[in-house]
Every structure is written in structure tokens, then in C-alpha cells.
């Protein structure tokens, strides 16, 4: 299939697909003249890349996973699970950091109210 059909099947743009190929997330496509030719495995790869990006993975985080998939001609489920667990831990840490920030904002608000109301300092 040509790049336009791959784009249509995956929701990715041809530009994004060429970018994935340039980064090594997709193997260099076979050619028929000047046209890139893709296979069904590429459809699944682009779908996986787009879904992974949607849940917070960067393209660089997906490189090893994609490389293993094409090298072994099978999806490395164990590696994917490790990446997902690592991303989940990062999200937990981000949530903790956001909660601390929210607490700090509340403390700042309380201090401002206390200072300006108690001491009747003009704003």
C-alpha cells in the first residue's frame, strides 16, 4: 500500500509517517519507483505509535520497542509492559508533584488573605 492509504488507515499524516521512518520507528519502506510501499505490520506500528503518543509517550521512548518489533518480526509484549509500568510510575510522580503544588498555592492564598485582611494593608 502507498503512504496515502497507510495514512488513511491509521489517521496519521503522510508527513508524520515519513517522520516515523526517519526516526527509525518504521523501517525504511520498500520502493516502487518514487513511491513508498507499506505492509500490514506498518499499519499496526503506526496505530501503536499514535496511541502511545496519545497517552504520553514520546517518540524517542518508543524507539527500542519499534526496533525490536521489526528485528524479531513480533511485538515485544514484555518490553511494552515495562515501558507502560515506567510511564505509569512517572504519572504517579507527576500527580504527587501537582498535589504539592496545589497545596503550596492554597498556602500562598491563605497567607495573602491573612496578610491583607488581618493587617488591612491596601492592595
Regions found by a protein language model. Name each.
Residues 26-33:
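Beta-hairpin "wing" of winged helix-turn-helix
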Residues 17-18, 49:
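Short, hydrophobic-biased segments on the C-terminal half of alpha helices
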Residues 6, 13-16:
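Short glycine/proline-centered loop/turn elements that form peptide/ligand docking sites
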Residues 2-5, 27, 40-123:
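Arg/Lys-rich, alpha-helical DNA-contact motif
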Residues 7, 21:
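The alpha-helix within a helix-turn-helix
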Amino acid at each position: 500500500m502507498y503512504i496515502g492509504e497507510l495514512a488513511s488507515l491509521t489517521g496519521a499524516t503522510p508527513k508524520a509517517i515519513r517522520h516515523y521512518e526517519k526516526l527509525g520507528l518504521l523501517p525504511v519502506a520498500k520502493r516502487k519507483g518514487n513511491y513508498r510501499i507499506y505492509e500490514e505490520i506498518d499499519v499496526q506500528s503506526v496505530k501503536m505509535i499514535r496511541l502511545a503518543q496519545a497517552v504520553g509517550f514520546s517518540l524517542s521512548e518508543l524507539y527500542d520497542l519499534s526496533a525490536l518489533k521489526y528485528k524479531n518480526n513480533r511485538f515485544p509484549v514484555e518490553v511494552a509492559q515495562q515501558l507502560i509500568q515506567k510511564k505509569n510510575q512517572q504519572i504517579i510522580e507527576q500527580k504527587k508533584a501537582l498535589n504539592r503544588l496545589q497545596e503550596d498555592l492554597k498556602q500562598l492564598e491563605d497567607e495573602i488573605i491573612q496578610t491583607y485582611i488581618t493587617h488591612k494593608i491596601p492592595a
